[in-house]
Amino acid sequence: ACDVSIEGNDSMQFNTKSIVVDKTCKEFTINLKHTGKLPKAAMGHNVVVSKKSDESAVATDGMKAGLNNDYVKAGDERVIAHTSVIGGGETDSVTFDVSKLKEGEDYAFFCSFPGHWSIMKGTIELGS
């Protein structure tokens, strides 16, 4: 399948720590569902995809960007894909070109809401 569904909750947790992207897919979609009840201003979640080595800097720059920008710096070329920030009961998805992922590179997905990225994160890898 060329998509995955991820859930985030009010306890600052994703329900998965790793995503494998089938390298035969042209595009890959991440579907995010917030299973909690808290509003996005208090406990918002998104999914940001970047190289593992860029994760910390992308999250730090994202904090400065604010909620109106989904805690992602505008035009950040280190960001491969990201969803909007959503609150409890909401869903969002993002589709990206699989050619942006290179074999042998380490990729991460994380929530860039302030204070979340150190806990709400996992790995993304190309697989078959």
UniProtKB/Swiss-Prot annotation:
Entry annotated with the keyword Disulfide bond: yes
The UniProt entry, under CDD domains, shows:
Azurin
Question: Which keywords does the record carry?
Answer: Copper, Disulfide bond, Electron transport, Metal-binding, Periplasm, Transport
Got any disulfides in this one, which pairs? 2-25
Q: Which cofactor does it need?
A: Cu cation
What would be one Pfam family of this protein? Copper-bind
How the cofactor is bound: the record states: Binds 1 copper ion per subunit.
User: Where along the chain is Cu cation bound?
Assistant: 45, 111, 116, 120
In Gene Ontology terms, what is one molecular function of this protein?
Answer: copper ion binding
Compartmental location:
Periplasm
Reply yes or no: does the keyword Transport apply: yes
Provide the Plastocyanin-like domain boundaries: 1-128
The record's listing under SUPFAM superfamilies reads: Cupredoxins
This protein's GO CC annotations? periplasmic space
What does the record give as the function of this protein?
Transfers electrons from cytochrome c551 to cytochrome oxidase. Transfers electrons from the tryptophan tryptophylquinone of the aromatic amine dehydrogenase heterotetramer.
Quote the NCBIfam families the UniProt record gives.
Answer: azurin
Q: How does it assemble?
A: Monomer. Interacts with the AAUA/AAUB heterotetramer complex.
What's the protein here called? Azurin
